[in-house]
């Protein structure tokens, strides 16, 4: 009776060749702005930011097909999103929101820490003895 296991293991080269021929498993995400992004299936759940908008790679943004070769449902959307300013009568001088300046002082939640030079020598002796 022949053994069920081969005498030599299968060649790793053959497995590598087959892996190269396999299609890369990736998923397409069509965004509201009209852009399409592909990501590897191993990256699912990490999310990304595109044009200042954070997108999660979960089930809500997947491409929805009508049939085998038809376009996604929202592909024919002409606008690039809603208009931000509805009232055009208000003048807009600066469209960039100012950011708070960085300070060199201590944060308000942390008190000022004393300098290590001001600590008494007896403290260090007691600490390391």
UniProtKB/Swiss-Prot annotation:
Keyword check for Hydrolase: no
Keyword Zinc-finger: yes
Alphabetic keyword roster: Activator, DNA-binding, Host cytoplasm, Host nucleus, Host-virus interaction, Inhibition of host innate immune response by virus, Metal-binding, Phosphoprotein, Suppressor of RNA silencing, Viral immunoevasion, Zinc, Zinc-finger
GO biological process: symbiont-mediated suppression of host innate immune response
A GO term from the CC aspect: host cell nucleus
Location of the motif Nuclear localization signal: 13-28
Region of interest (Transactivation), ranges: 115-129
PTM statement from Swiss-Prot or TrEMBL: Phosphorylated at Ser-109 by A.thaliana KIN10.
Residue numbers of Phosphoserine PTMs: 109
Subcellular location: Host nucleus; Host cytoplasm
Region (Disordered): 1-20, 73-118
Superkingdom of origin: Viruses
Zinc finger (unnamed): 33-50
Major subcellular location class: host cell
GO molecular function: DNA binding; structural molecule activity; zinc ion binding
Amino acid composition bias (Polar residues), ranges on this chain: 74-86, 94-109
Alphabetical list of InterPro entries matching this protein: Gemini_AL2 (IPR000942)
Function text: Strong activator of the late viral genes promoters. Enhances the expression of the capsid protein and nuclear shuttle protein. Acts as a suppressor of RNA-mediated gene silencing, also known as post-transcriptional gene silencing (PTGS), a mechanism of plant viral defense that limits the accumulation of viral RNAs. Suppresses the host RNA silencing by inhibiting adenosine kinase 2 (ADK2), a kinase involved in a general methylation pathway.
Assembly behavior: Monomer. Homodimer. Homooligomer. Self-interaction correlates with nuclear localization and efficient activation of transcription. Monomers suppress local silencing by interacting with and inactivating host adenosine kinase 2 (ADK2) in the cytoplasm. Interacts with and inhibits host SNF1 kinase.
Domain notes: The zinc finger and the transactivation region are involved in PTGS suppression.
Similarity remark: Belongs to the geminiviridae transcriptional activator protein family.
Descriptive protein name: Transcriptional activator protein
Species assigned in the record: Tomato mottle virus (isolate Florida)
């Amino acid at each position: 009776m022949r053994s069920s296991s081969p005498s030599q293991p299968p060649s790793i080269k053959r497995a590598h060749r087959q892996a190269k021929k396999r299609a890369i498993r990736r998923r397409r995400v069509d965004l509201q702005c009209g852009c399409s992004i592909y990501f590897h299936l191993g990256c699912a759940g990490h999310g990304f930011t595109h044009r200042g908008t954070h997108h999660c790679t979960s089930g809500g943004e997947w491409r929805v097909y009508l049939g085998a070769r038809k376009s996604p449902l929202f592909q024919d959307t002409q606008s690039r999103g809603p208009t931000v300013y509805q009232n055009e009568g208000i003048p807009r001088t600066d469209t960039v929101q100012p950011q708070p300046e960085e300070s060199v002082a201590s944060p308000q939640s942390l008190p000022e820490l004393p300098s290590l030079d001001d600590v008494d020598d007896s403290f260090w002796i007691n600490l390391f003895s």
